[in-house]
Every structure is written in C-alpha cells, then in structure tokens.
Amino acid sequence: MTATTNPNKALWEKGDFTEIAATMRESGEALVGKLGITEGMRVLDLGCGDGTTAVPEAQLGAEVLGVDIAANLVAAGNARAEELGLTNLRFEEGDATDLSLLDDESFDLVISIFGAMFAPNPFGVAKEMVRVTKPGCRIVMGNWIPNDPTLVAQILKISAAYSPPPPEGFISPVTWGVEENVVERFTAAGVAADRISFERDTYSFNSPGSPAELVADFRAYYGPTMNAFEAAAANGKEDDLQAELEKLFDEQNTTDDGTSIPATFLRVTVKK
C-alpha cells in the first residue's frame, strides 16, 4: 500500500490497541455472523486493527485483506493469521483515504468497523470504498454515534473535555455516526440514497477484570485516552479524568462477574 502522512498513524501506533481489541472479540465475531459471508468472497477490512472482524471473516472462508494505518497492528494481525493457520487472510499497512494500489471493483464486501470513521477526509474515504467495491456488492461500516449515552461516545466526549481544541478544519470521527452525513458522503461518491440503510447495533467490551481495571487498560493502551491523560496531567487534572472514567465504566457495567459494557453504534450498509 502507499505511504501516508495521515496524523492518525501516530495515534493508533501509540500504546497497544490489541489489548483493547481483545475485549471486543465476541462482538466482532457476532457482527461478522450477520453479514452473509460465504466461502471465496473477496473482503476488504479497512481499519482492521489486529483482526477483530477480519479473523472471523477468514474463518468463514472469505479471501480477506486487512488494511490498517498502524504498523504494529498490521504485524499483530499477521501473527494472529499465522497462528490460526489462516492462509486466506493477510494484513497490510495502508490509509483508508488512499487505496490506489487496489483495483477498481475488486471486492465483494468492504467492511470498516470503527476504522475508516477515524480517517481524515471523509468524502475521500467514501469515494475509495465505493471505487473498490464490485457493482451490486456491499460496504458495511460500524460508526460510533455523537452524544450517545453509551460507553465509547462518552469516553470520547469526556476525553475531549480534558484535551486541547482540535486543529482548524478537523472533522470529528463521530460525524460518521449521523445518518445525514453518511448519505451525503456516499451520494457524493455516486451511490443512490435509497441504496444506503441504517441500523442501531451493539458492541460489548468484555473483560475478566473490574471496571477500574478496564479503565487502566484504556489509559495504558488506547491512543485517544492516552492523549487525554497526558493533556489532563499537564493541567493538574489527571485524577479528575480518572475519576470520571471510573464512574462511567462502573455505571455502565452490566455484570457482577468481571466487566461487560455494551456500546451502541450505527451500522451502515451501502449497496453499490
């Protein structure tokens, strides 16, 4: 894939997102099971991390290419594929805004679950996803929803309150969680509005440890939270941020045995 100057590369190579992804495996497998993937399908998984959805796609027999901007996550994904004996799955470093090394109309399914939504230039991202999808085939996105009361939207909201203002021209990733924005971006890429559909869905974060231990994992391994703590520490508000997140995780935990926290997202299906 092509080299990138995308500033998100440093963000997602920070920490070790595989530690957070490990809490999302069950939901990733469940989501993939809803997508009608069959043996031999060509699947592009954008912003794939270490394979939370790419691995179950390959286990269903699809030929899967996982693309992620973070070199460490690509390496972790390829290690998982090798360990699992999945010769039909490979991971490559790349940028969702520039898939120029991939041929037009070459994939039966393009999927991006909490991945491409974080890329800058959302119109460019939509255009590239449409370009590489075969006619009559699908794009599926999972996008966090702005101001949603569940976990991830609240983590991002709380973290933003402790962080410096974003640079001029910054487009928030959660704008992908607004249906009107999604329609605007894909229609600009040539898709008819009536070919775009939406559904609210749920991803759960499951961990054997306590909610406070899961907060510690986010603080240690999740780039956006790590940045928020660095900014909070510079202003003497590190303990305040810690307390807010621990309260959030504790209130949203649904089990007495470890931690299980559901988070609502917008599932987008685009039929080319």
Protein language model annotation of sequence segments:
Residues 3, 9-13, 195-256:
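C-terminal helical/coil "lid" or tail adjacent to the Rossmann-like core of SAM-dependent
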Residues 119-120, 133-135:
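Helix-to-beta-strand junctions that scaffold the AdoMet/dcAdoMet cofactor pocket
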Residues 123-124, 130, 138-209, 225:
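Conserved catalytic/acceptor-binding region of the Class I
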Residues 97-109:
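A short acidic, Gly/Pro-enriched loop at the edge of an enzyme's catalytic core
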Residues 1-41, 52, 76, 83-84, ...:
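Conserved class I S-adenosyl-L-methionine
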Residues 108-123, 145:
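A short SAM/SAH-binding and catalytic strip from SAM-dependent methyltransferases
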Residues 42-99, 124:
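Class I SAM-dependent methyltransferase SAM/SAH-binding core
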Residues 189-191, 264-272:
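Core SAM-dependent methyltransferase catalytic element
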